[in-house]
């Protein structure tokens, strides 16, 4: 049995006192090293039955998917420096951000034990309310993408949606926030205020199709017919 445990390989034991992946009886378990208490590099880590790992490693080399040897020392340092306490600190920091966001967005903020989320449907509805619109000019995930662009443009906040790595959700997802990063930003209240201000800017842009198109797609240089096509098409 193979388990792709992703960040849960650390979050489960550290936060919820759950068994480690291989303690569940799995033959193989995989996780990544780029988040949730580890510091990179961004590669996969496979562990388990020695013979199975060797076979999979050989096939990875055949496909050119293996981790480059130059990354081994960085991976080793990341593993050696991992502490479950760090994961709990990240969760606590996220909880404080969630509290600050709840004070601004109320019931529209969706909170889980380890995340705070502005769901795309709620985000678009909120922006439309602030803009006084009854008909959405974009689809929900475009609202999240636009908010991500605005947060980066105005506050230097880099989110998954801007970076172009397909997330598992259309929500604006806040999780496992380093306290050092939050402190440099000015604290949880400052971050919540930044998101709120960016939602205000998003609301204004909903009434300006050209500006919204430029925000999401850059300056459109194609034919006029293509340039005026609906954003959500």
PLM segments and residue spans:
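Conserved PLP-enzyme active-site core in the AAT-like
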Residues: 1-87, 98-102, 160, 176-181, ...
């Amino acid at each position: 049995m193979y388990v792709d445990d992703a960040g849960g390989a650390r979050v489960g034991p550290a936060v919820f006192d759950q068994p480690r992946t291989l303690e569940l009886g799995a033959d193989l378990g995989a996780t990544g090293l780029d988040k949730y208490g580890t510091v990179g590099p961004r590669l996969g880590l496979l562990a388990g039955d020695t013979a199975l790992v060797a076979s999979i490693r050989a096939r990875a080399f055949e496909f050119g998917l293996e981790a480059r040897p130059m990354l081994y020392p960085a991976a080793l340092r990341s593993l050696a420096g991992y502490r479950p306490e760090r994961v709990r600190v990240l969760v606590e920091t996220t909880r404080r951000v969630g509290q600050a966001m709840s004070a601004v967005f109320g019931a529209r903020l969706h909170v889980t034990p380890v995340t705070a989320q502005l769901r795309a449907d709620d985000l678009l509805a909120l922006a439309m309310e602030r803009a006084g619109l009854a008909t959405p000019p974009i689809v929900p995930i475009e609202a999240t993408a636009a908010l991500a662009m605005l947060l980066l443009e105005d506050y230097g906040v880099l989110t998954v949606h801007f970076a172009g790595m397909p997330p598992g959700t259309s929500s604006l997802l806040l999780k496992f926030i380093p306290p050092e990063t939050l402190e440099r930003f000015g604290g949880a209240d400052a971050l919540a205020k930044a998101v709120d201000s960016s939602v205000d800017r998003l609301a204004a842009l909903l009434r300006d199709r050209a500006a919204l198109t430029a925000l999401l797609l850059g300056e459109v240089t194609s034919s006029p017919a293509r340039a005026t096509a609906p954003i959500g098409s």
